[in-house]
């Protein structure tokens, strides 16, 4: 029997105590607070952090009464940053706030100072965004990304529920999957390598770390069928990771954009999501592109798909929409593109209405800021709802 031609592909994730992810979560917690009181809020909120300090800065125009310092401390505390030992002390760290209003030049160009109807609202900036979907997992997401993300989420779960009391908030995961290319569709065969680097306290040995990670983190997350005697495990390979969080590394909003999306699969236009209200097409454009790509795969039009959309500042209609099914389409890509443009309204104001993106509160955007924006079962993730698409398979 001929040997199957395979390749290796790797995706990484970081969990909620990673300094960059801490910043994403603070930025989105600020966005939630603004939208909860004033759905028309215009938010571009950046966060940076280093030892004993968090700074929130950017442009925010809102009628909401927002206590930025409280949001910073609450978010840090919720993640588990409760002492300098673990990397940051939520109660006593310095919190700096430097927030200004949105530029009036941008405001008049995008929403005419709130005089425009939703379908007339222009894109908040230029740029291009991508959505991706693949039939290799029930979530219609790449397996390498799904496993890396779930390992990170599980690390946090066993830290917070006490199963692995030696864990500290910061941590990273990485999964290498061996794939077969089936005429453009991706078929995962096995997990080749699992890498976990997690912050830990002084009391635990490296052997205990490895044993606990295998038992409490890897076993519950990675399906048995993907693990074999050849699977390689790198568990805290550096040997020591006691200092972590903002004490170990500086953090910044928007530095984990591949972890937020598809783990290196598909493509990325470069625009981050967190801290941005939905008039920013970096966020809303990527969300509608995911819904379009996911709907194409879920409706059986293709096994794998990427959608690109692009915008000019102040212009409602997208400049371009592109669809590529990597040769897996049941009908030609140009037909699928026609179905997409007939079924999805890519104008920013209409994306906001159709995906209900102005609804804040309930930690809606905070939830997106760790463990990925896509492939998650949660009614707040409205862009994950599959749209039924009418199409006919060509007769043979």
Swiss-Prot record:
Alphabetical list of NCBIfam families matching this protein: metK
Residues annotated to bind Mg(2+): 12
Protein purpose: Catalyzes the formation of S-adenosylmethionine from methionine and ATP. The reaction comprises two steps that are both catalyzed by the same enzyme: formation of S-adenosylmethionine (AdoMet) and triphosphate, and subsequent hydrolysis of the triphosphate.
Molecular function GO labels: ATP binding; metal ion binding; methionine adenosyltransferase activity
Pathway: Amino-acid biosynthesis; S-adenosyl-L-methionine biosynthesis; S-adenosyl-L-methionine from L-methionine: step 1/1
Protein known as: S-adenosylmethionine synthase 3
Annotated keywords: ATP-binding, Cobalt, Cytoplasm, Magnesium, Metal-binding, Nucleotide-binding, One-carbon metabolism, Potassium, Transferase
Keyword Acetylation attributed: no
Reaction(s) catalysed by this chain's protein: L-methionine + ATP + H2O = S-adenosyl-L-methionine + phosphate + diphosphate
InterPro entries in the record: ADOMET_SYNTHASE_CS, S-AdoMet_synt_C, S-AdoMet_synt_central, S-AdoMet_synt_N, S-AdoMet_synthetase, S-AdoMet_synthetase_sfam
Lineage: superkingdom: Eukaryota
Cofactor note: Binds 2 divalent ions per subunit. The metal ions interact primarily with the substrate. Can utilize magnesium, manganese or cobalt (in vitro).
Binding site for ATP: 18, 170-172, 238-241, 249, 255-256, 272, 276, 280
EC assignment: 2.5.1.6
Cofactor (UniProt): Mn(2+); Mg(2+); Co(2+); K(+)
GO biological process terms held by the UniProt record: one-carbon metabolic process; S-adenosylmethionine biosynthetic process
Compartments reported by the entry: Cytoplasm
Binding locations of L-methionine: 59, 102, 249, 280
CDD domains: S-AdoMet_synt
Family the entry assigns: Belongs to the AdoMet synthase family.
Enzyme class label: transferase
GO cellular component: cytosol
Keyword ATP-binding: yes
Assembly and oligomerization: Homotetramer.
PROSITE patterns (alphabetical): ADOMET_SYNTHASE_1, ADOMET_SYNTHASE_2
Gene name as annotated: METK3
Binding sites annotated in the UniProt record for K(+): 46
């Amino acid at each position: 029997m001929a040997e199957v031609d395979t390749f290796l592909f790797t995706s990484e994730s970081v969990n909620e105590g990673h300094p960059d992810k801490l910043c994403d979560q603070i930025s989105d917690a600020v966005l939630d607070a603004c939208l909860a009181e004033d759905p028309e809020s215009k938010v571009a909120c950046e966060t940076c952090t280093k030892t004993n300090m968090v700074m929130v800065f950017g442009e925010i125009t809102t009628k909401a009464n927002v206590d930025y310092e409280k949001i910073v401390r609450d978010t840090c505390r919720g993640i588990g940053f409760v002492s300098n030992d673990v990397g940051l002390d939520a109660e006593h760290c310095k919190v700096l706030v430097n927030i200004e209003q949105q530029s009036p030049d941008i405001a008049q160009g995008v929403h005419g100072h709130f005089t425009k109807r939703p379908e007339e609202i222009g894109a908040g900036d230029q740029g291009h965004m991508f959505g991706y979907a693949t039939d290799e997992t029930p979530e219609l997401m790449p397996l390498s990304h799904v496993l890396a993300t779930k390992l990170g989420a599980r690390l946090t779960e066993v830290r917070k529920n006490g199963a692995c009391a030696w864990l500290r908030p910061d941590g990273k995961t990485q999964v290498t999957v061996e794939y077969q290319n089936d005429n453009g569709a991706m078929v995962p065969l096995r997990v080749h390598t699992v890498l976990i680097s997690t912050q830990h306290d002084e009391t635990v040995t490296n052997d205990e770390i490895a044993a606990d990670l295998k038992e409490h983190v890897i076993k519950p997350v990675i399906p048995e069928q993907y693990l074999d005697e050849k699977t390689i495990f790198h568990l805290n390979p550096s040997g020591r990771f006691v200092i972590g969080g903002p004490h170990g590394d500086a953090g910044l909003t928007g530095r984990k954009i591949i972890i937020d999306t598809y783990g290196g699969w598909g493509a990325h236009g470069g625009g981050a999501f967190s801290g941005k209200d939905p008039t920013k097409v970096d966020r809303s454009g990527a969300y509608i592109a995911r819904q379009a790509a996911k709907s194409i795969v879920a409706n059986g039009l293709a096994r794998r798909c990427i959608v690109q959309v692009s915008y000019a500042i102040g212009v409602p209609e997208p400049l371009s929409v592109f669809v590529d099914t990597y040769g897996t389409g049941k009908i030609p890509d140009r037909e699928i593109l026609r179905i997409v443009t007939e079924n999805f309204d890519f104008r920013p104001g209409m994306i906001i209405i159709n995906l209900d993106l102005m609804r804040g509160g309930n930690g809606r955007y905070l939830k997106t800021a760790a463990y990925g924006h896509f492939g998650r079962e949660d009614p707040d993730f409205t862009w994950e709802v599959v749209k039924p698409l009418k199409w006919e398979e060509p007769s043979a």
